[in-house]
């Protein structure tokens, strides 16, 4: 095994590679130093002793050893051996700057370098029992919606590099959404009952997609307006955002509101191991409890209480709201993208430092900076000259 980037390329061994060596594999730091700077790597029994691998097997017994290991791991699983759930292609309708899914819409404004991401709750009553949830399969709202959201985030990240700001909106019936998620949580065994494998996997997918949004290097601003559906897991979108503006419109038939549920009490943890509410109100359990107190009776948090509770950044009336949102969008897109990537990555991950937060909340942005330094990609940089007979020339100043 080897990670030869430092001695050969003058950069780091993959995003988080070093962190995984010491945090995940538990390799001693001085041995990790040797491993990371020896181009030929570490072989055989030494790799086992240094905890880089679990075992070594000769070529003649390698397949047998792998098979035995796989069987031992399989015996620990409580997943049944029956049929899985087929996931059909999402096949969104892409029309110019708009990508339209069943429950998600992504609209790009390339000129302003902004995007609008709208996520919709279920339009009909969802299955409420374990069997009916499983029978719904890939058409289950939670599974379909979060697959679409995942796809939209990936399209945004990979195809629209110059888009720097995303407005988050939600639509739908909050009660239908809360009913659907309550049934899913029950089926997944979060209340202490028997966990159904399918419901659990759907819940884990939801957790991963929220984490993907957490580590997406775009400014996110949530807009809570009359007709929004920031309830349950969709409220997590609100607390993933870098800012949240709420419209207080006294003339609206239904005021802008936020509804919390058991989904916000730790079912979808961040990479730091805390819920988004716990991260928002770090070491302030009283504030977390005050927000979650609205959950049992599904009491809506309306504008009057939202700012007092701290669940949004600002509440503005119908006169100030449009201008304040517009000014924020204009100001944010005028700032340095590099500075914002570093700032947002640090501010989003308050609380405990974990392997996940080190890799995605710190190293991704930091390592990209190292890759653009002259020592890596300059005319005499290690990456530029890799494979040539010339030796790189380094600026030896530590920064």
Q: Which residues does each PLM region occupy?
A:
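CoA-thioester-processing core
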Residues: 1-32, 231-293
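Active-site or pore-adjacent capping/gating segments
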Residues: 311
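C-terminal alpha-helix plus adjacent terminal tail
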Residues: 26-52, 56-237, 244-254, 286, ...
């Amino acid at each position: 095994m080897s990670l030869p980037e430092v001695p050969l390329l003058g950069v780091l061994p993959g995003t988080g590679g070093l962190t995984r060596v010491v945090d995940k594999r538990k390799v001693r730091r001085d041995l990790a130093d040797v491993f990371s700077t020896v181009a030929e790597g570490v072989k055989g029994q030494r790799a086992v002793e240094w905890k880089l691998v679990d075992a070594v097997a000769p070529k003649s017994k390698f397949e047998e050893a792998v098979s035995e290991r796989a069987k031992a791991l399989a015996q620990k699983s409580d997943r049944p051996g029956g049929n899985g759930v087929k996931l059909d292609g999402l096949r969104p309708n892409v029309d110019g700057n708009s990508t339209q899914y069943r429950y998600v819409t992504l609209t790009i404004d390339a000129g302003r370098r902004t995007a609008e991401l709208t996520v919709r709750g279920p339009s009909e009553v969802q299955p409420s029992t374990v069997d009916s949830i499983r029978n719904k399969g890939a058409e289950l709202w939670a599974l379909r919606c979060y697959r679409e959201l995942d796809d939209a985030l990936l399209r945004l990240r990979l195809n629209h590099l110059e888009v720097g700001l995303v407005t988050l909106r939600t639509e739908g019936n909050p009660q239908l959404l809360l009913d659907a998620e309550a049934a899913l949580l029950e089926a997944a065994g979060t209340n202490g009952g028997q966990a159904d494998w399918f419901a659990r996997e759907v819940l884990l997918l939801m957790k991963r997609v929220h984490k993907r949004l957490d580590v997406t290097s775009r400014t996110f601003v949530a807009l809570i307006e009359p007709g929004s559906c920031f309830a349950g897991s969709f409220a997590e979108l609100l607390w993933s955002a870098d800012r949240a503006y709420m419209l207080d419109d006294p003339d609206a038939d239904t005021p802008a509101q936020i509804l919390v549920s058991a989904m916000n009490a730790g079912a979808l943890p961040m990479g730091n191991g805390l819920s988004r509410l716990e991260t928002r109100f770090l070491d302030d359990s009283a504030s977390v409890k005050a927000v979650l107190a609205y959950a049992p009776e599904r009491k809506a948090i309306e504008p009057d209480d939202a700012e007092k509770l701290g669940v949004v950044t600002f509440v503005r009336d119908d006169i100030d709201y449009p201008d304040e949102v517009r000014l924020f969008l204009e100001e944010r897109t005028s700032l340095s993208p590099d500075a914002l990537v570093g700032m947002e990555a640090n501010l989003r991950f308050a609380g405990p430092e974990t392997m996940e937060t080190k890799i995605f909340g710190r190293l991704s942005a930091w390592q990209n900076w190292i890759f653009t330094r002259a020592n890596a990609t300059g005319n005499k940089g290690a990456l530029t000259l890799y494979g040539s007979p010339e030796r790189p020339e380094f600026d030896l100043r530590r920064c």
